[in-house]
């Protein structure tokens, strides 16, 4: 009897053990499969969120019947609901990108969260939809998603225009164009196929052309939009020829396969020249800068924020991803040429800034100078220089949009003029604005403990290791940036209140919440730069020494 009970107990225990084993086996298997599935879909979901916003906004309409149905008061803009949809979608996209940043593993240089849609090659050409992020691209993605909610808030006052033949879909078209631009920029920074990189690099031009050309601030907006279009198109033709030549040699457009291929030095130089023309226009470097300040001067406030904060960074990312990674010998060979153009950009832009009478053009010229410093760091062929260029790109993505908000949204919305000589003594009636304006002007000049200072310092250290004379010349440009920054603040804020200005209120709650996160992040990165440097170090080191 005891033996029977013992056998029964053994069978019972074995049965439960087998049941628990099968249970945990299926649970673990499902968890692994689900984690693999979610890992694959993470980046694809990030791309789809702004597209869902377009789908939600596009079918909407605004009529008097809609006002009656929704019980909106006569003084309430019926476009508010679609503005809220766009704002919420952009905030969700930003929060989702932060989740990706938290899940990102900075200890490996490999692409993460990869997704590969197609793998079918034709006899003539092959290009697959492949996406992934590494330590370099993840921060450009986060910067992109961060600036779009700010852009939507900055342009909150935009309303449907009655000048375009009574067009009632103006705001809807504007919001859809902005969300499309966000989608294209995200795709640009996450694709791992050079042909797709080219497609999205050039596709960004379409919504930018519409934003500047339709919602620009004056009659010159059409000329500025076409100038932007023609400059970019001219550079893109050379870039396309180089990419086709890369495919002809490698037989693939995959980033990883191209990186493993060793090009002949003479071929590298030809390919490098074709791609660099497009990048030099996007930076922009001297003498290819004339489209930028015109586009900034005519663009709406959201267009200026995105141009300065993200679009110029396409050149930084493209130089890192294509020129330095795939064509390292040619990049080293042409480094003196790039540094000469960068020095000319820094000095010329700084001197031209001192002569400006339009404060949006002044901030635009200052962007040209800062992008010149970024180009110096990129082509210094040092870890410090490249990491400094990434930090300065991020810092410029905070400071320059903040300056455009302060002068292009706050001041221009109140006084309707961008001419600097009409402003004086603003601190008397706008003290909070003056504090923010002071902080960002000194940040723009590279004051210590700001993100700009960290980026400029690392760029100069890297450049000094490559060529001390070039570093000294670049430092003189930074001194000039301090000169025009202090002059601009002194001219607008101090002195007796200008007779050309009406008394007005200080910045409102919406404008305060626009500027505060930019201020916080600029100081945070300046005090704790290792929060970014530690995450990009492996990718930058691999990029520099693997080739």
Model-derived regions: residue spans:
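Alpha-helical multi-pass transmembrane bundles of energy-transducing inner-membrane proteins
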Residues: 64-66, 77-82, 110, 173-267, ...
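Predominantly late transmembrane helices and immediately cytosolic-facing juxtamembrane segments
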Residues: 400-404, 469-503
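Short, amphipathic, aromatic/basic-enriched membrane-interface segments that mark the entry/exit
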Residues: 156-174, 331-336, 357-363, 425-428, ...
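Juxtamembrane/interfacial segments at transmembrane-helix boundaries in multi-pass membrane proteins
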Residues: 105-128, 163, 220-223, 236-290, ...
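C-terminal ends of transmembrane helices
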Residues: 55-71, 150-163, 211-217, 283-294, ...
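Alpha-helical transmembrane segments of multipass membrane proteins
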Residues: 54-58, 152, 186-187, 210-211, ...
């Amino acid at each position: 009897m005891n033996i029977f009970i013992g056998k029964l107990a053994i069978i019972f225990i074995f049965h439960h053990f087998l049941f628990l084993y099968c249970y945990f086996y299926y649970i673990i298997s499902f968890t692994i499969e689900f984690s693999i599935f979610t890992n694959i879909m993470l980046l694809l979901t990030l791309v789809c969120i702004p597209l869902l916003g377009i789908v939600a906004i596009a079918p909407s309409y605004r009529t008097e019947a809609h006002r009656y149905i929704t019980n909106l008061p006569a003084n309430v803009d019926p476009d508010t609901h679609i503005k809220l949809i766009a704002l919420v979608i952009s905030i969700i996209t930003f929060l989702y990108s932060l989740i990706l940043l938290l899940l990102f593993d900075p200890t490996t240089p490999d692409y993460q969260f990869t997704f590969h849609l197609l793998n079918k090659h034709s006899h003539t050409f092959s290009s697959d939809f492949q996406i992934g992020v590494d330590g370099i691209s993840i921060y450009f993605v986060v910067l992109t998603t961060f600036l779009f909610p700010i852009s939507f808030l900055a342009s909150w006052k935009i309303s449907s225009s009655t000048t375009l033949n009574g067009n009632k879909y103006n705001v809807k078209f504007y919001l859809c164009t902005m969300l499309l631009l966000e989608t294209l920029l995200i795709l640009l920074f996450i694709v791992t196929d050079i042909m797709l990189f080219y497609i999205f690099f050039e596709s960004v031009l379409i919504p930018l052309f519409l934003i500047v050309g339709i919602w620009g601030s004056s009659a010159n907006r059409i000329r500025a939009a076409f100038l932007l279009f023609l400059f970019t198109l001219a550079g893109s033709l050379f870039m396309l020829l180089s990419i086709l030549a890369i495919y002809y040699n490698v037989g693939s457009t995959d980033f990883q396969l191209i990186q493993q291929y060793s090009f002949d030095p003479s071929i590298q130089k030809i390919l490098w020249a074709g791609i660099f023309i497009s990048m030099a226009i996007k930076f922009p470097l001297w003498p290819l800068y004339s489209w930028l300040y015109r586009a900034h001067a005519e663009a709406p406030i959201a267009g200026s924020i995105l141009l300065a904060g993200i679009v110029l960074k396409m050149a930084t990312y493209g130089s890192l991803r294509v020129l330095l990674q795939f064509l390292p010998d040619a990049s080293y060979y042409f480094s003196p040429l790039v540094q000469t153009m960068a020095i000319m950009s820094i000095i010329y832009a700084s001197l031209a800034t001192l002569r400006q009478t339009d404060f949006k053009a002044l901030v635009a010229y200052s962007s040209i100078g800062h992008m010149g410093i970024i180009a110096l760091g990129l082509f210094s062929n040092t870890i410090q220089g490249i990491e400094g260029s990434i930090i300065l790109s991020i810092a410029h993505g905070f400071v320059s949009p903040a300056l455009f908000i302060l002068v292009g949204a706050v001041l221009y919305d109140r006084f309707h003029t961008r001419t600097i000589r009409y402003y004086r003594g603003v601190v008397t009636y706008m003290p909070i604005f003056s504090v923010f304006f002071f902080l960002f002007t000194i940040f723009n000049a590279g004051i210590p403990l700001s993100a700009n200072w960290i980026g400029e310092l690392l760029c100069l250290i890297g450049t000094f290791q490559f060529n001390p004379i070039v570093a000294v010349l670049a430092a003189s440009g930074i001194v000039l940036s301090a000169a025009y920054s202090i002059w601009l603040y002194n001219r607008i804020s101090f002195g007796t209140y200008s007779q050309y200005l009406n008394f007005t209120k200080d910045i409102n709650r919406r404008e305060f919440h626009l500027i505060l996160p930019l201020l916080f992040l600029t100081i945070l990165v300046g005090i704790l730069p290792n929060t970014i440097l530690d995450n990009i170090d492996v990718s930058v080191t691999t990029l520099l020494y693997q080739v």
